């Protein structure tokens, strides 16, 4: 058993660590609230872009937009959004396990895989995989938002260009979904083709409305250019929204991880204090025994 001085030193060390984790919990909570506001602000834009694409597509049903129609899948692409920093529990590893399962299924079906990674954790993880081809990387830095946005936009454009050129036939995005402060879960959604924005009922209704002249648009450019640009903006907005949502997940997970660390530190301190009291009790008992032995000898 350690002596009393060593135990006191350990208690002080754990208390210092507890102060750090407590401060990190407060910082993460503050950042999480800001991230949630940003996440909620971008959603109306994505929803509006979705509605516009529906209306424009319905008004031009004769144009076979390449972003809206499915095709035979020979190669797929993934945009994986992770964090740049750690200390956020199992947030990243749970996401990687989820997307890796899908990637392995594609590889078993002899479907090629290209990956665009956003975040250093995803970059480090997928760089170790032999059967996965990383075609683009990007990072999001709060201190250089404009530079980060340009880098992410460039990485996403690489995947869009590969889809347009027919090098990949389907594009997915893997990120974390913010359910609540204490719950975040991995999510895999299809970015391209974006035909999923229409249900069968909507397609039928849109065709009827278009036939009746319900929407009558006048375009400054060709409908092809307008619709293609809208689809690209829609995809970019989805990725942007996913990055902001993933940031909220990161701060929520870090807040909970630091809270658990702070609580565990309290338990460790209590146990160390118990050990300290046992050591002191043993020392006092030994001293009393020595005193009694000395008195008996006299």
From Swiss-Prot:
It is found in: Cell inner membrane. Its main location: membrane. It holds the Pfam family ATP-synt. GO terms for cellular component: plasma membrane; proton-transporting ATP synthase complex. One of its GO terms (biological process) is proton motive force-driven plasma membrane ATP synthesis. The keyword Hydrolase does not apply. One of its GO terms (molecular function) is ATP binding. Keywords: ATP synthesis, Cell inner membrane, Cell membrane, CF(1), Hydrogen ion transport, Ion transport, Membrane, Transport. The keyword Protein transport does not apply. It comes from the Bacteria. Signal peptide: none annotated. PROSITE patterns: ATPASE_GAMMA. It is a peripheral membrane protein. Belongs to the ATPase gamma chain family. F-type ATPases have 2 components, CF(1) - the catalytic core - and CF(0) - the membrane proton channel. CF(1) has five subunits: alpha(3), beta(3), gamma(1), delta(1), epsilon(1). CF(0) has three main subunits: a, b and c. Produces ATP from ADP in the presence of a proton gradient across the membrane. The gamma chain is believed to be important in regulating ATPase activity and the flow of protons through the CF(0) complex. This is ATP synthase gamma chain.
């Amino acid at each position: 058993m350690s002596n009393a001085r060593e135990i006191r030193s350990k208690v002080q060390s754990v208390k210092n660590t507890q102060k750090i984790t407590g401060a990190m919990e407060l910082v993460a909570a503050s950042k999480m609230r800001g991230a949630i506001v940003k996440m909620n602000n971008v959603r109306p834009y994505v929803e509006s872009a979705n509605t516009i694409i529906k209306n424009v597509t319905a008004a031009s049903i004769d144009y076979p937009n390449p972003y809206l129609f499915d095709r035979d899948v020979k190669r797929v692409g993934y945009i994986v959004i992770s964090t740049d920093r750690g200390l956020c529990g199992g947030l990243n590893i749970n996401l990687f396990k989820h997307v890796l399962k899908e990637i392995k299924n594609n590889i078993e079906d002899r479907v090629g895989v290209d990956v665009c990674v956003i975040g250093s954790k995803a970059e480090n993880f997928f760089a170790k995989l032999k059967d996965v081809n990383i075609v683009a990387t990007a990072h999001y830095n709060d201190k250089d938002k404009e530079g980060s946005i340009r880098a992410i936009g460039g990485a996403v454009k690489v995947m869009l260009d590969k889809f347009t050129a027919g090098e990949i036939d389907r594009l997915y995005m893997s990120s974390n979904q913010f359910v609540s402060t204490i719950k975040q879960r991995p999510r895999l959604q299809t970015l391209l083709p974006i035909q999923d924005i229409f249900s069968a009922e909507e397609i039928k209704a849109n065709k009827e409305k278009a036939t009746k002249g319900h929407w009558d648009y006048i375009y400054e450019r060709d409908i092809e250019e307008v619709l293609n640009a809208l689809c690209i903006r829609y995809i970019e907005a989805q990725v942007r929204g996913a990055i902001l949502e993933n940031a909220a997940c990161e701060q929520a997970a870090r807040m909970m991880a630091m809270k658990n660390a702070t609580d565990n530190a309290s338990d460790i301190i209590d146990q160390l204090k118990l050990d300290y009291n046992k050591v002191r009790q043993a020392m006092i008992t030994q001293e009393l025994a020595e005193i009694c032995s000395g008195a008996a000898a006299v």
